[in-house]
Amino acid sequence: FEAIIKPLDYEVSKMRTIKSEDELKIIEKACRISSLAHIRAMKSVKPGMYEYQLEAEYVHEFMSHGARACAYPSIVGGGKNACILHYNENKNILNDGDLVLVDAGCEFNNYASDITRTFPVNGKFSKEQREIYEIVLEASKKSIETVVSGSNPLKAHETSVEIISQGLLDLGLLEGDVNEIIESNKYFDFYMHRVGHYMGLDVHDVGGKDINGDWLNYAPGMITTIEPGIYINESLDVPEEYKNIGIRIEDNVVVTETGFKVLTDLVPKEVNDIESLMNS
């Protein structure tokens, strides 16, 4: 007889891409625990703390709610460390006047969560920090709006690129025509990663592409992160007051039958809400 041997990885990936109701409940729980941890950190941070001490606040909150592990090594980057995408040494002092970028999420019953928030160590954004933050926030909101059934993940990324490029142009940190900036990838010096990835049993989960490697359209039950960012390292030719500002905002979003649901909206991300929480 004849037998046809086919790899199963693609079929298994498809199954993992669409979450069942039971899976969604677990992931929602993981997202809630991680959200509470970010809130705890915003209330706890103060100048003079070490990055690892702030990291400990997350671990404490995770375990207090039954999440015994982090979904990935936490990133706690203060000041210029926030401009390093996968910084996880977490060993430096958090200084007055700096921002701290924290990318941290727990694993609960084998499922991941993945949240990033950026907030001022002293509880108050500077003018320049706020200007950059508002660009990233706008990119976050508009990109999330594209996470609906039938839309393609490329649209979410392109939306974030357009908003970030225009925002940097408006501030004078990029020059030229916005379309030329995008086509020539000039924005890439400030925003060098994709806007999101699928999430589930792994924090960077499998699936999302067809057998030819093309992105599948969003469908109900898919969970993606949306995480635009701007990273202004000290080597860039920009005014001194903008250097070493690194900002990312990351939420976990599930596609529903009627639109989308943000699983991590418990954590504030509006500037006024963050400052109010930190100074309460």
Please identify what each model-predicted range represents.
Residues 1-280:
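Active-site neighborhoods and metal-handling regions in enzymes and metal-associated proteins
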